Amino acid sequence: MFEKGSLIPYLTAGDPSVEKTLEFLLAVEEFAGLIELGIPFSDPMADGKTIQESHYRALRNGFKLDDTFRILREFRRHSSTPVILMTYYNPVFRTGVKKFLGEAKASGADGILVVDLPVSHAGEFLDAAKEEGLKTVFLAAPNTPDERLREIDKASTGFVYLISLYGTTGARDRLPETAFEFVRRARKICNNKLAVGFGVSRREQVEELLKAGADGVVVGSALIELISRSENPVEELRRKVAELSGYSRAL
């Protein structure tokens, strides 16, 4: 789904508006190997404070699930950069698995990651995704046993998303050595490409994770924080993503 060395920016759909989200997507797509577009949810338990607040802002502004597909359809008029939708299972369940995935595919999504759907309960989802031609992405944590990691790798048709830290998302100044140990372990086990996220905020971290064996690096909270405090978020976002991706692709 993406080239080795790619930066993968995460954006929350609808924060602060549908129109701004489209502007953000167009600002970063030139420098992104793939984009994660998060679907706002009222209880984003896996996310840290920064991304949680972005979900809440979008929902307070009246954001609806259909707005995600509307943003993506408009984005597809301008760009072919791969996009995966990142969601919790509740919106998928409420919509219906087949209907949700059908709308995602029709709007231009390339894949989907359901944060709180374990592989062991993903049978219907996997069948429907295969039918629609959508790539599937599953999460693995540092404490995921090797055998479980093999199961996740087998179920993933897009890439495996490695959580570099225990706990929720959020930018950190430094990543612990356990994050790099996990990447090296997963590299020996997984056949899929590996994307690493949670806690990444600086280009030095991107470089370190790629050297450890990651194929792509996800940056989310640092970008959402920039958007929330900037007076010129489109230009600052573009500059930040260009900086991070340029550093990663120079390896």
UniProtKB/Swiss-Prot annotation:
Catalytic activity: (1S,2R)-1-C-(indol-3-yl)glycerol 3-phosphate + L-serine = D-glyceraldehyde 3-phosphate + L-tryptophan + H2O
Active site as annotated: 36 (proton acceptor), 47 (proton acceptor)
Annotated GO CC locations: cytosol
SUBUNIT field: Tetramer of two alpha and two beta chains.
PROSITE patterns found in the cross-reference section: TRP_SYNTHASE_ALPHA
Lineage: Archaea, Methanobacteriati, Methanobacteriota, Thermococci, Thermococcales
Pathway: Amino-acid biosynthesis; L-tryptophan biosynthesis; L-tryptophan from chorismate: step 5/5
The protein's enzyme class: lyase
Role, per record: The alpha subunit is responsible for the aldol cleavage of indoleglycerol phosphate to indole and glyceraldehyde 3-phosphate.
CDD domains documented for this protein: Tryptophan_synthase_alpha
Alphabetized InterPro entries for the sequence: Aldolase_TIM, RibuloseP-bd_barrel, Trp_synthase_alpha_AS, Trp_synthase_suA
Pfam families, alphabetized: Trp_syntA (PF00290)
Gene3D superfamilies hit by this protein: Aldolase class I
Gene Ontology MF terms in the entry: tryptophan synthase activity
Keywords annotated in UniProt: Amino-acid biosynthesis, Aromatic amino acid biosynthesis, Lyase, Tryptophan biosynthesis
Protein name (database record): Tryptophan synthase alpha chain
One biological process term in Gene Ontology: L-tryptophan biosynthetic process
Family indicated by similarity: Belongs to the TrpA family.
EC assignment: 4.2.1.20
Keyword Lyase belongs to the record: yes
